Amino acid sequence: MSSFAGRMKEYPSISLDRFDRENLHARAYFLSHCHKDHMKGLKGPLLKRKLKFSLTVKLYCSYVTKELLLSNPRYAFWEDHIVPLELDSPTSISLIDESTGETEDVVVTLLSAGHCPGSVMFLFEGAKGTVLYTGDFRLAVGDAARMEYLHSGDRVKDIQSVYIDTTFFDPKYYQIPSREACLAGIQQLVQDWICQSPYHVVWLNCKAAYGYEYLFTNLGQEFNSQIHVNSLDMFKKMPEILCHVTTNRATQIHACRHPKDEEFFRANRLPCGSTAPDGIPLNIISIKPSTIWFGERTRKTSVVVKMGSSSYRACFSFHSSYLEVKDFLSYICPVNIYPNVIPLGKTVEDLTELLKPLCRKHCGREEIVYKPLGALKRTRKRSTSEGSDSDGDLFEEVSTAPRRRKITVSDLTTVAIRVRPHSANADSHDNDQTYSLIKLCPSAHTSNYMDCTESNDDDDDEDDAAEQTPAAAPPPSSTEKPCSKHTHSDSSLTSSTQPCWEKFFKAEVVLTDESELENSQNTQTLSTENTASQSPELFQDEDEDSSVHMSSSQSTHISDAGTESLSQVDTIMVQEDHSKACNLQHKTEEAAELKSDSQVSSDFELPPTPGSKVPQPEDLKELYRKLAAGEDVVARQIF
């Protein structure tokens, strides 16, 4: 017997299986099936009056429930207000408050309950969460896992609350035989009885007007016989059942009921009063489908038990057992569980203690928390001179060497002096010189070599040759030596297909006398090879002619035309190893004795800007040390 009050906490504007008292103010009604304990107030005068003046109130149910309801003339006034819904078909419903115009939208899905013909469960999805109302249901173990609309993709939906049928949620009804097992026991008893003679008759003592149609259809198919019932009105629009029932008394299987306030003869136990045509007495047995009686048994019994000389009890349940309810709740694992029925001999507190371990908080499953995806991160652009087909992009190796920082000349670190061209008022702007220092940025590359941008195009070679001609025009001074080795290296570079790195970054040693070394020390900086870092490049424009002060490793293989494209990436590696910094002083002393041909040549000597001060070796030494160690270098002006 249902004790559900009709309202759900999440959606209080909806009433289910209860149509009296506070439910009269509901915006919509839902009927799970047509059993009387779920139809209280459905034909009441107050609800009938409300429907007369309402334009929006509807009753939602299944198609079978609609036909069963309207087959009774007392519910005919609902005909214009019933909206049947398909099974397993989500439907959007607007709940409108006629007094204020407020609207609430929910999506409802009807799921098969297996209780009786037309019985359904209602799954509500809306702003207040997902809620399931089962009504009366009989589901076997594992049926919940086969219901598509209880799932979202591969997981069970996040169900906030379940209002569940707990008719037999009692350990004494731990396991109830399945309907198939009960049907098999009843069929065997009927077959053994009616096959004896045409005068052997079976009466199914069913207490409800409908709900046993499962028995009727299966027995009719098994024995090719129709079942006698009192009326066919409720089955007229259900052809799958109508073909197995009849009002003809001349049949061996009866399911007719005793009329109220009508006496019947004791000698004839059939409610319809049927007798044999020739007057021979009928041999009648009664079979009473029951569940509670079997639940009270302490010993294991068969599904059919003989009670007397001609009466039997057969186990047949319309409600799920304790094990089946537990399996259902354990699978969907709702946050809240509310019982719809208080079992005989139990209290609400008893049910609460039994249901508490099945709630999500206690069943061990974590609560589902929905989080936003978050902001997408942009990919970091990698600065590298390697080609797109470089193996470094395909494979990552953990380097055992100390991590080094990669610095580009044009983009990452450079110290450049911009000087205005000489003009009439050039003296007033002699001090308009600035150093531009780019912040050091560590690189993810750990390769221990120097990158160099080169061009092997024929057009570039022609341009280099054209620009080298005017540069060679001024005759060398008597104290300078011709750079024969430099010319030879340029010619051999173009002919070589796979040059070695040593040709690019190691300058050939030229031994000179002490006087030449002393003259060149004051005007030239240390080479990159000797200092393990690259010195700042100074660019000056004087008399509209550009001359470039370059390191010895670059001047060995790059022509004057290459100095115009110094914006290209020319990277060096700054090692953080302290051992390199310790050898800085020793290498500086060796630099005084080892000079390349390009450093000796006076063509690259630049006159100092008027008013400027030539950096002292001590200042440059400190600058080189900071660059080699990867420390930040503070830009300052040189006056």
Curated annotation (Swiss-Prot):
Its main location: nucleus. It comes from Danio rerio. InterPro entries: DRMBL, RibonucZ/Hydroxyglut_hydro. It is an enzyme of class 3 (hydrolase). Belongs to the DNA repair metallo-beta-lactamase (DRMBL) family. One of its GO terms (cellular component) is nucleus. GO terms for molecular function: 5'-3' DNA exonuclease activity; damaged DNA binding; endonuclease activity. This is Protein artemis. Residues 548-560 have a biased composition (Low complexity). Residues 450-496, 515-570, 590-617 are annotated as: Disordered. The keyword DNA damage applies. Pfam families: DRMBL. May have a role in the processing of DNA double strand breaks (DSBs) prior to their repair by the non homologous end joining (NHEJ) pathway. Probably exhibits both exonuclease and endonuclease activity. One of its GO terms (biological process) is telomere maintenance. Residues 518-537 have a biased composition (Polar residues). Its EC number is 3.1.-.-. Gene3D superfamilies: 3.40.50.12650, Ribonuclease Z/Hydroxyacylglutathione hydrolase-like (3.60.15.10). The keyword DNA damage applies.
